[in-house]
């Protein structure tokens, strides 16, 4: 299945149904009171995280999703039916962003987590609501309010503990194959990896971590060179980054310069990502003697002024790979992921009584000409129907 990690869709919540103007008409009751019902609320739009999905390909071609409109009110005090909600399933790790305002609406990081992204409109009021002692036959009603509509940007960000960085052909996919059961494509040409992939590295019988491999970066990737830097977003949720460096590049480039290229592109993308713990891992030491590899690495880190720990491995032969995975596991256990507590639902600020009061103040007449069944001569709220003559 094709990997799609971004999608732009149109979301439309349902409009609220309009109120109804109606009067009770039955046998022997030719002039009954008002009986127009309220409209129904519009349907909402939700996102729900589904662990069985791993791509946003479902939203590549189908771009518009609309919830059902609330039905209008009817006579006999019948309230309109509420519009049906729609729920869109997305992979775990999806972020929802308002395309116009760039506001982050929420992150779905757990299976089954649900996010309201468009609220349906509220119902209009029927003329029964406007009945009073001085207005026995109201012809006012209110219209339903529009539902929320927005262009929604969906971004899938993989959930991994460890993220791999490096130039093309640094050996990232080979490392993934060495530490996990994942089988990403490996070849001797650049950009063998075209989409992110995940692998589960097991350390012992009861410990493991998830590692993410992304396509390699090249110089000026932030300006669109190569595959660009768009895949770096998949590393934002990682706890540690592994910067894999080819100690003996085939193009005879300087490994120190190659490290600087990745560092620069990382800062160009996000300072927050660049501030994550990052380990230098020198790969392909099997292409030279141990003494030569050690001397070359020491010369590189001295030029860079790098003072943190670094590692020398061969992903192809597995040399020192087990030691590295144990160190990674120990680091992850010492720095557990900050668990995001489920926030309590916001208190509902919407009050029906307030809404009804405001709606009644902005009511519209069914007819252009105002009409009621009271005459200007009414005295103390009593309409004079017949007055008997003199003696």
From Swiss-Prot:
InterPro entries: G_OBG, GTP-bd, GTP-bd_Obg/CgtA, GTP1-OBG_CS, GTP1_OBG_dom, GTP1_OBG_dom_sf, OBG_GTPase, P-loop_NTPase
Keywords, ordered alphabetically: Cytoplasm, GTP-binding, Hydrolase, Magnesium, Metal-binding, Nucleotide-binding
Required cofactor names: Mg(2+)
Organism this protein belongs to: Actinobacillus succinogenes (strain ATCC 55618 / DSM 22257 / CCUG 43843 / 130Z)
Matches recorded under Pfam families: GTP1_OBG (PF01018), MMR_HSR1 (PF01926)
CDD domains: Obg (cd01898)
Signal peptide: none
Family label: Belongs to the TRAFAC class OBG-HflX-like GTPase superfamily. OBG GTPase family.
Record bears the keyword Magnesium: yes
Ranges annotated as biased composition (Acidic residues): 363-382
Location within or outside the cell: Cytoplasm
Obg domain sequence ranges: 1-159
SUBUNIT field: Monomer.
Gene: obg
One GO term describing the cellular component: cytoplasm
GO biological-process terms attached to the record: ribosome biogenesis
Superkingdom: Bacteria
Annotated binding of Mg(2+), by residue: 173, 193
Positions of GTP binding: 166-173, 191-195, 213-216, 283-286, 314-316
EC number annotated for this UniProt entry: 3.6.5.-
Domain OBG-type G residues, every copy: 160-333
Function: An essential GTPase which binds GTP, GDP and possibly (p)ppGpp with moderate affinity, with high nucleotide exchange rates and a fairly low GTP hydrolysis rate. Plays a role in control of the cell cycle, stress response, ribosome biogenesis and in those bacteria that undergo differentiation, in morphogenesis control.
Top EC class for this record: hydrolase
Protein name (database record): GTPase Obg
Gene Ontology MF term list: GTP binding; GTPase activity; magnesium ion binding
